[in-house]
Amino acid sequence: MNLLILEGISISPYVWGTLIFSFIVFGVGFTLGGFGGMFSECSGIINIALDGSMLLGAFSGLLVCSQIGDALKGNELLNNWAFVNFIYLIGLFVCVIVAFAFSFLLSFVSIRLKADQTIVGTALNSLVAAIVLIGNTIHRAADLPEMDVSMFYNVMLYKFEDMDFFNGMFSNLNITIIVGIVLIVVLTLIMNKTRLGLRIRACGENPAAADSVGIKVNKMRYIGTAIGSVSAAIGGYIIFTCLRLGEWTLTSGVFGYGFLVLAIEILGNWKAKNITFAALFFALFTSLGTFMTTAFSGGVKAFYNSKAFYCMLPYLLAVLSLIFFSKKSHAPKAEGIPYDKSAR
């Protein structure tokens, strides 16, 4: 195996391939998470619960996939790429259903009860973290199979002979990443090119004017929040299933990425194209968290060999970016304001 060796750094082509794959996965996951915030907030609902959506989507989808995989342990079907990806699609379907139901917790309390949306979103994040933690604890106490999808790893559509770079890129490729890329294109077109997208944006900018031409503002807000929650949940599910994160734990999964995509959404100025570029920027630095500790040998100073430093880097950059660029961001004018038809 050929190695690139530079002053204590030993990097194999396989590792370079996994870096690029991680970059793509994080890019897709973060973009979908950012789109989740965009759809919700462009309709007029502040969605702080993106982290909860990503966490719940990853947990529910993984739970289904791991149970199906364990039930079929030892079966030749688990060596079939198409069948394994069918299991991933089942998990994705469950993820969508759970996220769709979860979205109504935020939208109902925000629209019907007119509660403070920031507080509601924060509470929902805490609720989901507690549900996932308790669910995982009960799962372990019941002596059920471990929650992981490691039985699906290395089930490749095609293995490249003597081409470690491409094997690294495609070693854990599954259909969810393809679905994610297609979904990014579809959601971009919906927001920018369709009547539904125009109506959603109108409800976030000037709900009174939208109502005056017959648009049902609250209905559009329910739809925007539902699309946003599902999009973020799929992003979380893709990140966990495409990257080799192993057994589920609250901190080794997607916990915390929702707050990063909030920053991505703000930096993207609630526009699909800008959110995509911002997501790719942060995806690069997030993927470095794993890559650096794999690539560097022990000859490099401990500071540069610290995974914690590189895992912290995207969040540090998010804070700095918000400090310098947040003044240029323009949120929807009616964001966070419950619509009262009588006050029109």
What spans do the regions from the language model cover?
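Transmembrane helix-bundle core of multi-pass membrane transporters
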Residues: V128-N192, T251, G298-K307, G336-R344
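Transmembrane alpha-helical segments in multi-pass inner-membrane proteins
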Residues: C242-Y315
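Helix-loop-helix "hairpin" substructures at the membrane interface of multi-pass membrane proteins
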Residues: G168-W248, F277
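Membrane-interfacial amphipathic/re-entrant helices at transmembrane-helix boundaries
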Residues: M1-G33, I46, S60, A71-I90
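Alpha-helical transmembrane segments within multi-pass membrane transporters and channels
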Residues: G74-A129, F281
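Hydrophobic alpha-helical segments embedded in the membrane of multi-pass proteins
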Residues: G27-G36, G52-G57, A101-F104, K219, ...
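Short loop segments and helix-boundary regions at transmembrane helix junctions
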Residues: C42-I46, F102-F160, K193, F255-G256, ...
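Cytosolic-side transmembrane-helix boundaries in multi-pass membrane proteins
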Residues: E205-S212, V217-K219, T293-R344
